[in-house]
Curated annotation (Swiss-Prot):
Annotated catalysed reactions: alpha-D-glucosamine 1-phosphate = D-glucosamine 6-phosphate
Organism, as annotated: Clostridium botulinum (strain Alaska E43 / Type E3)
Binding site residues for Mg(2+): 100, 240, 242, 244
One term under GO cellular component: cytosol
Positions where Phosphoserine occurs in the chain: 100
Family affiliation: Belongs to the phosphohexose mutase family.
Disulphide bond pairs: none
Classification via InterPro entries: A-D-PHexomutase_a/b/a-I, A-D-PHexomutase_a/b/a-I/II/III, A-D-PHexomutase_a/b/a-II, A-D-PHexomutase_a/b/a-III, A-D-PHexomutase_C, A-D-PHexomutase_C_sf, A-D-PHexomutase_CS, Alpha-D-phosphohexomutase_SF
This protein's record includes keyword Cell membrane: no
Name of the protein in its database record: Phosphoglucosamine mutase
Native organism taxonomy: Bacteria, Bacillati, Bacillota, Clostridia, Eubacteriales
GO biological process: carbohydrate metabolic process; peptidoglycan biosynthetic process; UDP-N-acetylglucosamine biosynthetic process
Coiled-coil regions listed in the entry: none
Active site: 100
HAMAP family for the chain: GlmM_B
Length: 447
């Protein structure tokens, strides 16, 4: 069997690829592997606003209960809430049902260990082995030894209070726009900013089960960019479906991506002496402009493979406090063990208030190099063709020669979708756009 787990849990089209049976199996195997030896283990379960969440939650919980574990239902909360509450509630594990920024037909299941960290490859493989063995050796308790489920009504409030306490003062006098992507942040983000005294304007906070990420949120920020200007806001924030990431919008309606957010937060933490070893952890997808800006600010960069799990691994290895991705996954390890959109938004807003400058002014120390990202739809079993085909390899070499050291080519298979991502950076936008599309078309022609 192919590996079930991708870079962010198990993901697929709900009810065909990610079926109720698979959710049951994951619940049963996950509860067994993650809580072995624990007496009446406790596992938290949450979901985003997708229509398929109810079906998958029911099946997943049935699997958890079938091995005698307790399932604590958190309801609709952001992914980072699961990471935080797993620690806060002394649970043995946490599970989030979400496909993050993907369209509504997708869903996913990702596990957190008892410390709120995403699982290692070894633990994920262990869960898969239990399923493939047809649950050999896994107990099937009866009677009073079966598990029970209970609903934790305070989950959303507890997470929101935690997020608010990550900034040292209120946001009174600030006008802030939020795009909740009709997803998991639609209550917590609005409440947190309002409780802190901001004047809050909200769009896409009315989920109906089918409109999550639909032309909104961090993958479609255009509406928010217009809205910030229209309402005269100081800044805006766009979350994705499960609110583990966010992007910002400045007072002029310009999108501020994760690279800028990381630079801004790293610079502030360095100024107040809280950036461990003056080091920021990013991925190979970060813009070269971030390298240049950080060099000028005296900030060192550590680079990892793409995926917030790899950023987190590097951070925990050397106790770095800040890391993230251009996509808006930002990890403040002093506060949470995963990307946290609400915590990120609160940090940015508090820095803008503290510095008494506009977001555009604070971001002006960094200049982005033109960057183009083209997705080529490629079946999962052909994703490595760019490594093996001589014509593609030669085309990459030719592009690198033309860029002449000022830019780069990066090709990366998606860990969650049947895509190969072709990314180019260089000084000339038109030139790299043409090169990126040409290379993507060449990859497609080889399928």
């Amino acid at each position: 069997m192919d590996r079930m787990f991708g870079t962010d849990g198990v993901r697929g089209i709900a009810n065909t690829e990610l079926t109720a049976q698979m959710a049951y199996n994951l619940g049963r195997a996950g509860a067994y592997v993650l809580t072995e030896g624990a007496h009446k283990p406790k596992i938290l379960v949450a979901k985003d606003t997708r229509i398929s969440g109810d079906m998958l939650e029911s099946a997943l919980v049935a699997g958890i209960l079938s091995v005698g574990a307790e399932a604590v239902i958190l309801g609709v909360v952001p992914t980072p809430a699961v990471a935080y509450l797993t620690r806060e509630y002394n649970a043995d594990a946490g599970v989030m049902i979400s496909a993050s920024h993907n369209p509504v037909e997708y869903n996913g299941i990702k596990f957190f260990n008892n410390k709120g960290y995403k699982l290692s490859d070894e633990l994920e493989d262990g869960i898969q082995k239990v399923i493939e063995s047809d649950f050999e050796g896994v107990p099937s308790p009866i009677g009073i030894d079966l598990g029970r489920e209970r609903i934790e009504v305070a989950a959303l409030e507890d997470y929101t209070e935690f997020a608010k306490q990550t900034i040292p003062y209120n946001l009174k006098g600030m006008k802030i726009a939020l795009d909740c992507a009709n997803g998991a942040s639609y209550k917590s983000a609005v409440k947190a900013f309002r409780d802190l005294g901001a004047d809050v304007f909200v769009i896409n906070d009315n989920p109906d089960g089918t409109n999550i990420n639909k032309n909104c949120g961090s993958t479609h920020p255009e509406e928010l960019m217009d809205y910030v200007v229209k309402k005269g806001c100081d800044l805006g924030f766009a979350f994705d479906g499960d609110a583990d990431r966010c992007l910002a919008v400045d007072e002029n309606g310009k999108l501020i991506n994760g690279d800028f957010i990381l630079m801004l937060c790293a610079n502030y933490l360095k100024e107040i002496g809280k950036l461990k070893d003056d080091t920021l952890v990013v991925t190979v997808m970060s813009n070269l402009g971030l390298d240049i800006a950080c060099r000028g600010l005296g900030i060192k960069l550590e680079k990892t493979k793409v995926g917030d799990r790899y950023v987190l691994e590097e951070m925990t290895k050397d106790n770095y406090v800040l890391g993230g991705e251009q996509s808006g996954h930002v990890i403040f390890l002093d506060y949470n063990t995963t990307g946290d959109g609400l915590v990120t938004a609160l940090q940015v807003a508090s820095i803008v208030k503290k510095k008494e400058k506009t977001l555009s002014e604070l971001c002006s120390v960094m200049k982005e190099l033109p960057q183009v990202l083209v997705n080529a739809t490629v079946p999962n079993d052909k994703k490595n063709i760019y490594l093996e085909d001589a014509e593609i390899v030669e085309a990459i070499k030719e592009i690198e020669a033309k860029l002449n050291g000022v830019g780069r080519v990066l090709i990366r298979p998606s860990g969650t979708e049947p895509l190969v991502r072709v990314m180019l950076e260089g000084e000339n936008q038109v030139e790299i756009d043409e090169m990126a599309h040409g290379l993507a078309n060449l990859i497609l022609s080889k399928i």
